[in-house]
């Protein structure tokens, strides 16, 4: 069987979480779950999930990812990942866990798009290495790069490094709290849409992407998301599961951890298919909605009626959402 052309690859850590709740049995071996470091551990799974939702077989095989697993990584989990029918490369370490995979000599090197969760310093280093490897492999075309800043570096002292790194990526996507923290604003200010717009514009004005043609996408919790670029005024999209009039969380929201990662995976697929940032954010919103309906990953069932995730069709949900926002 020939190797498929890869459209999307997410680069990040792969860790099984153990989640402990007061007065409850712990949840063990949660694939891409929450937990103390869940935002980092789940990133590659959630982003890949978001992309996979909108890449049905055989297009699912254009979704490429590599995971390094330790000797104790459950085979059941590996089988579940393989059931997604993607291009999954599993490197098992017999004596120690390893959390990063190398792109050398793999089909992932020719991907059309990459998602990174990195510090600004590592972002520039890894992107430079990626482009060098691609050039050596005869892949001179520049891929589409989405950068999600590592949350723990979103502090005022890292603002300038983040702005510098943003000049080398196509999409910069912090969440609202991370964006506010970068500029030294309080968490309360992060919930104000005007503040988020103003900060996103400041980032954009400093230069995002080659020739300043990049996009800032802020994932803003209960406010949804906002897309800002040089050619696009701030465009807000509501969350798929809005809070009630009393401010209470929607009943379908079980665990929001990782929804932002899934948003970005789906965003990339949407952008590759439509070349439109707002349309891509619709994909992202719907992709994120599947990630927050449970702890861990949604259930995939394939049958005569196609693929259902948690009993729902991703494309039907996308059509429903586009009607809501008037697209």
Q: Could you tell me what each predicted segment is?
A:
Residues 83, 91-125:
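Conserved phosphate-binding/catalytic loop of the ribokinase/pfkB sugar-kinase fold
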Residues 8, 63-65, 114, 145, ...:
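Hydrophobic/aromatic residues located in beta-strands of well-ordered beta-sheets
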Residues 45, 57, 212, 231, ...:
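Conserved post-catalytic alpha-helical subdomain immediately downstream of the catalytic base
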Residues 4-12, 16-95:
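Substrate-binding N-lobe of the ribokinase-like
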Residues 74-88, 131, 232-242:
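Short, electropositive alpha-helical surface patch
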Residues 134-144, 149-244:
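Conserved phosphate/ATP/ADP-binding segment of small-molecule kinases
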Residues 42, 175, 260:
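Short, conserved phosphate/pyrophosphate- and ester-handling motifs at nucleotide-, phospho-/glycolipid
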Residues 5, 110-112, 168-169, 200:
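Short, well-ordered alpha-helix to beta-strand connector turns
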């Amino acid at each position: 069987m020939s190797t498929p052309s890869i459209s999307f690859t997410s680069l990040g850590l792969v860790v099984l979480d153990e989640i402990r709740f007061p007065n409850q049995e712990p949840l063990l071996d949660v694939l891409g779950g929450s937990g103390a470091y869940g935002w980092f551990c789940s990133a590659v799974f959630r982003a890949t999930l978001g992309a996979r939702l909108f890449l049905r077989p055989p297009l699912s095989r254009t979704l490429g990812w590599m995971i390094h697993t330790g000797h104790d990584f459950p085979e059941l989990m590996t089988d579940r990942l393989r059931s997604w029918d993607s291009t999954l490369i599993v490197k098992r370490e017999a004596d120690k866990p390893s959390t990063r995979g190398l792109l050398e000599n793999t089909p992932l090197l020719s991907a059309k798009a990459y998602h990174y969760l990195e510090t600004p310093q590592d972002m520039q280093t890894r992107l430079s290495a990626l482009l060098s490897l691609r050039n050596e492999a005869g892949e001179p075309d520049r891929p589409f790069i989405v950068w999600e800043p590592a949350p723990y570096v979103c502090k005022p002292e890292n603002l300038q490094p983040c702005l510098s790194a943003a000049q080398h990526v196509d999409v910069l996507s912090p969440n609202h709290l991370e964006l506010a923290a970068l500029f030294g604003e309080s968490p309360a200010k992060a919930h104000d849409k005007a503040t988020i717009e103003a900060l996103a514009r400041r980032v954009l004005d400093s230069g995002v992407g080659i020739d300043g043609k990049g996009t800032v996408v802020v994932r803003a919790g209960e406010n949804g998301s906002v897309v800002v670029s040089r050619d696009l005024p701030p465009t807000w999209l509501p969350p798929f599961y809005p809070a009630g009039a009393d401010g209470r969380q929607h009943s379908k929201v079980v665990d929001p951890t990782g929804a932002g990662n899934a948003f970005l995976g789906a965003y990339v697929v949407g952008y590759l298919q439509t070349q439109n940032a707002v349309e891509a954010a619709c994909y992202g919103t719907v992709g994120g909605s599947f990630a927050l309906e449970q702890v861990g990953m949604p259930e995939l069932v394939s049958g005569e009626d196609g693929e259902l995730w948690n009993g729902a069709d991703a494309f039907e949900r996308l059509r429903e959402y586009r009607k809501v926002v008037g697209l």
